[in-house]
């Protein structure tokens, strides 16, 4: 029985993780559920999975959760980052699923690694912000980091049984998002409703907007750079609208390996939870004859400048990826609040990056300072 702490239990990845846990309740149990808010959903999860601990963002939310739990509930309720870090460090926990959105997941994920827990990583911002620090700490502690992102799971699977010294290139696939065939003018004036309507995946609001700008793919480039220890120039993005091939790797002999599956996050989640084994999800493999054709083409950086900004930050290293991430979070939040138009998102990020002086070999404190500076600066650029 593998015992789990789930960071971000009420989000899309969290909900799908609990579906996998429910299906394989003889193999997994839940020790702690952690969320920001979404009290009603979290209360339902607590009553269903009976964890020893539930953690939310602050004291009022904790009180609201307690009021929704039945009298005599065995689940302790804590709040704040200290609560999240306690949840990942519980002695009985074998694996932490890191699925919090954004920078909020960094501290708890580092705490999990320090506690020697295996980490199933869905929060790409953890590596975007502090990739070198996190990977070095994981190596020091002997802690496996298993990717949940479908693309990084695909790369991880394609690398199995192969010596990485023979790797030539990583090919990250992108669906192209809801604006794949839209003009630049149509993209710049898009509404939140239009940007949230992803053609392939059902996701949370923030990652849906990142998918619409292609910033999500840019963050995945940076994540891949650290997770697989390859330079930015060894990673390329290719648009693949069918989302059947989740990523590919090519080797120095000209061969290429790809991982295919129907678009369903439960596959990547189950693989991370059960690695090196595989679970029978009762999910059919892609019907190649029915697909008829799979298409690929290069992304248009003129219409989707966020991807180019992410590659730039990845190449510049230092604290630029952390600044990119922070400025993006602020700009996306402003767009969702309808404070800025969609086309303003990359311009805010570009200006913040242009004003930043990168810190070489940054400490965790340097990264947090850069994150805070970028949020303040991006906020100052908003109406």
UniProtKB/Swiss-Prot annotation:
Keywords: Isoprene biosynthesis, Manganese, Metal-binding, NADP, Oxidoreductase. Its cofactor is Mg(2+); Mn(2+). 1-deoxy-D-xylulose 5-phosphate binds at residues 124, 150-151, 175, 198, 211, 216-217, 220. One of its GO terms (molecular function) is NADPH binding. It is an enzyme of class 1 (oxidoreductase). Belongs to the DXR family. Mn(2+) binds at residues 149, 151, 220. Catalyzes the NADPH-dependent rearrangement and reduction of 1-deoxy-D-xylulose-5-phosphate (DXP) to 2-C-methyl-D-erythritol 4-phosphate (MEP). It comes from Desulfosudis oleivorans (strain DSM 6200 / JCM 39069 / Hxd3) (Desulfococcus oleovorans). Its EC number is 1.1.1.267. The gene is dxr. NCBIfam families: Dxr, PRK12464.1. NADPH binds at residues 10-13, 123, 125, 204. InterPro entries: DXP_reductoisomerase (IPR003821), DXP_reductoisomerase_C (IPR013644), DXP_reductoisomerase_N (IPR013512), DXPR_C (IPR026877), DXPR_C_sf (IPR036169), NAD(P)-bd_dom_sf (IPR036291). This is 1-deoxy-D-xylulose 5-phosphate reductoisomerase. It comes from the Bacteria. It catalyses: 2-C-methyl-D-erythritol 4-phosphate + NADP(+) = 1-deoxy-D-xylulose 5-phosphate + NADPH + H(+). Pathway: Isoprenoid biosynthesis; isopentenyl diphosphate biosynthesis via DXP pathway; isopentenyl diphosphate from 1-deoxy-D-xylulose 5-phosphate: step 1/6.
